[in-house]
Regions:
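Bacterial N-terminal signal peptides
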Residues: 1-12
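Structured extracytoplasmic
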Residues: 15-202, 209-215, 220-256, 260-291
Length: 291
C-alpha cells in the first residue's frame, strides 16, 4: 500500500538513464539504533533534546498517539486546498539553479475499502484540469503520512522514545521509528518514467503531550534506492488544526512541507504550503464547501 510517492521528471535536464549494475547497498543504521550523539549529528534539530531515562512509557505513548491517528482517519472527509509549491534543483550540468513555482489544487479523497488510512491524494491545476509539473521533482502523499502510527500499522515498525523537546512553545514527546521491510505494507514509491522502486522509511515525530497529536513528522529513506539512483530524501511535515463550517468538523492537516533530496547528480528542495482548505463533495457534479 502506498504511503507516499516521489515523481522524477522524464524530460529536460534530468533525462533518466538505465540503472547501473551495482550490488544492493549494505543495510544502514536506522534512527531507532543510533546513539543520541549520532542522531543529533544526522538531525541537528534534536540538539536541545532532553533525553528519556527509560522506555517504560513508550507502550502507553504509542497507544495514545495511535488512538489520535486512528480518530483522524475515522473522522476524515474528502478535502481540497490550495497548494503553493516552490521547487529548486541544482546540478553539475546546470549553469544556474532550476527554479519552479506552481499553484495547484491538492485533493485528498477517501478510497472505498476496509483500510481507512489509504487516501487518494492528487493534484489539479487551479481550474480543475490536469496538473502540469514540467521539470519539477514532486512528492505526494502528505495527508496520510501519519499512518505509520495507526494501531493497525504500528507492528510494522520499530519505535523508540527519545525524550522531550520544545517545538512551537510546547514541550513535546519525541519518538523515532523505522519500518521493518520484511513486514511493512505502508511503502513509498519512487517513479522515474516506467521504473518504479519501493522504499522504506524511518522517521521522527514531535507529539503534543496533552492531545497526543503529531505536531511535526519527519521521514527519511532507510537506505538509498539504487534502482532509480535516489541517494537520499527527507520529508518534514508541519501540522495544524483546520476547522470547517459544515458540521463544525476539525481535522489535523499539513500546513507546510519541505522535501530535500539527492537524485543522480542533482540535489532538490521543495517547499509546499497549504491554505484555503475546503470539504470536497464528489457527486454528480463536484462542489466545494469552504470553512
Amino acid at each position: 500500500m502506498l504511503s507516499f510517492a516521489t515523481l522524477m521528471p522524464a524530460m529536460g535536464f534530468c533525462q533518466p538513464s538505465a540503472p547501473a549494475a551495482t550490488a544492493p547497498p549494505e543495510p544502514q543504521q536506522t534512527y531507532v539504533d543510533m546513539t543520541p550523539a549520532e542522531l543529533t549529528k544526522r538531525v541537528p534539530d534534536l540538539k536541545h533534546l532532553e533525553l528519556a531515562q527509560s522506555q517504560e512509557i513508550l507502550p502507553l505513548m504509542l497507544q495514545r498517539v495511535g488512538a489520535a491517528v486512528a480518530a483522524f482517519f475515522d473522522n476524515f472527509s474528502n478535502t481540497t486546498c490550495t497548494e503553493d509549491v516552490l521547487s529548486i534543483v541544482h546540478g553539475p550540468h546546470l549553469t544556474h539553479e532550476a527554479r519552479y513555482e506552481r499553484r495547484f489544487n491538492y485533493i485528498a479523497l477517501v478510497k472505498p475499502g476496509a483500510d481507512k488510512t489509504v487516501l487518494e491524494e492528487t493534484r489539479s491545476d487551479p481550474k480543475g484540469g490536469a496538473a502540469t509539473l514540467g521539470g519539477m521533482i514532486t512528492t505526494i502523499g502528505f495527508v496520510a503520512l501519519a499512518a505509520h502510527f495507526d494501531p493497525d500499522y504500528q507492528r510494522e515498525s520499530r519505535f523508540r522514545y527519545l525524550g522531550r523537546e520544545t517545538f512551537k512553545d510546547r514541550n513535546t514527546y519525541v519518538i523515532v521509528f523505522a519500518q521493518r521491510p520484511e513486514v511493512a505494507r505502508q511503502t513509498g514509491h519512487i517513479v522515474v518514467r516506467d521504473r518504479v522502486a519501493k522504499v522504506f522509511v524511518q522517521g521522527i515525530a514531535w507529539i503534543e503531550p496533552e492531545t497526543f497529536r503529531i505536531l511535526r513528522l519527519r521521514t527519511d529513506l532507510e537506505q538509498p534506492e539504487l534502482q532509480v539512483d535516489l541517494k537520499r530524501e527527507s520529508t518534514d511535515v508541519r501540522y495544524s488544526d483546520v476547522t470547517f463550517a459544515q458540521g463544525n468538523k476539525t481535522l489535523w492537516l499539513p500546513r507546510e512541507v519541505t522535501v530535500n533530496g539527492e537524485w543522480k547528480q542533482y540535489t532538490f528542495y521543495n517547499l509546499h504550503r497549504y491554505s484555503d482548505y475546503r470539504l470536497f463533495l464528489v457527486q454528480t457534479e463536484e462542489k466545494e464547501k469552504h470553512p
